[in-house]
């Protein structure tokens, strides 16, 4: 009986005291959840934050943290649900809509992604990230033409948006517009040195133009940037074969096959990559407090 008295009290408490207890319980659960999120104890963070939201469902910061924990545990539909509730409360918040678009992309729900982007575009027609996400939604639907249009709009707003230029170059090349793809590749090469994706685009452009000697050199730069690039070895092998270098072509093909059978297991940089991703999704700087 004493245990129950300790837990529930021997008599009813005044309303003000009960309110204080509820507030205290909410704060303890919320900040335990935030701390667990920082320490990457995601399952425990979810438990705490769900219980906190049961007490106070109007706390949007709590829902934001919960959405991040769900994303980290690959519970994307639950994350999207939390973001939807945040968007209902803050319909003018572009950051929430962009997060929804990002999660929809991870779920491969390109229709939802496009819908969210349209809402965001109505709020801020000059937000380059909105056009970038819309382009990715178009790509998901196989609509490369409109994807290029969206990326071009983003680049008109910000010519230094390298991710948009890279994706546009890749799509232009895929669509057979080699000359315009070459312009994007050259612009990126002048701006970014030693980037694997940029170098690979440049190599593929040279190959598509039929400039095999230049393509071979470009693929070599890709391999310098990433010695484990299976695509670079395989495609350079094709280029070397076209140049009549059968020995080099066979060596590249063998290297690609070997890496495909036993893919390299990187031991460094994984945690930093995860942390960087979480920071991108973190308007409250939960992960950016170091």
Features from the language model and the residues they span:
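Alpha-helical segment of the N-proximal tetratricopeptide repeat
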Residues: 19-61, 65-72, 95, 99-108, ...
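Structural signature of tandem alpha-helical TPR/SEL1-like repeats
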Residues: 40-47, 73-85, 107-119, 140-153, ...
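Short coil turns that delineate tetratricopeptide repeat
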Residues: 57, 91, 125, 159, ...
């Amino acid at each position: 009986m004493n245990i129950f008295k300790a837990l529930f009290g021997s008599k009813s408490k005044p309303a003000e005291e009960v309110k204080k207890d509820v507030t205290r319980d909410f704060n303890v659960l919320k900040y335990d959840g935030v701390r667990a999120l920082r320490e990457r104890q995601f399952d425990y963070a979810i438990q705490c934050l769900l219980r906190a939201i049961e007490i106070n469902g109007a706390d949007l910061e709590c829902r934001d943290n919960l959405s991040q924990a769900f994303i980290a545990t690959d519970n994307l539909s639950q994350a999207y649900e939390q973001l939807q509730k945040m968007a209902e409360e803050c319909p003018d918040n572009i950051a929430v809509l962009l997060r929804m678009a990002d999660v929809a992309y991870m779920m491969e729900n390109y229709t939802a992604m496009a819908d969210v982007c349209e809402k965001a575009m109505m709020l801020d027609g000059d937000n380059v990230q909105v056009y970038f996400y819309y382009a990715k939604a178009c790509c998901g639907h196989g609509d490369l033409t409109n994807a290029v249009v969206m990326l071009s709009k983003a680049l008109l707003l910000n010519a230094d948006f390298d991710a948009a230029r890279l994706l546009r170059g890749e799509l232009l090349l895929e669509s057979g517009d080699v000359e315009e793809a070459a312009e994007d590749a050259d612009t990126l090469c002048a701006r970014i040195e030693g980037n694997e994706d940029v170098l690979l685009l440049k190599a593929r452009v040279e190959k598509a133009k039929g400039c095999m000697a230049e393509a071979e050199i470009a693929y070599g730069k890709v391999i310098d940037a990433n010695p484990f690039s299976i695509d670079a070895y395989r495609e350079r092998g094709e280029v070397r074969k076209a140049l009549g270098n059968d020995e080099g072509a066979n060596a590249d093909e063998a290297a690609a096959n070997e890496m495909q059978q036993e893919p390299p297991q990187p031991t460094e940089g994984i945690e930093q990559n995860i942390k960087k991703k979480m920071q991108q999704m973190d308007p409250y700087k939960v992960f950016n407090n170091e």
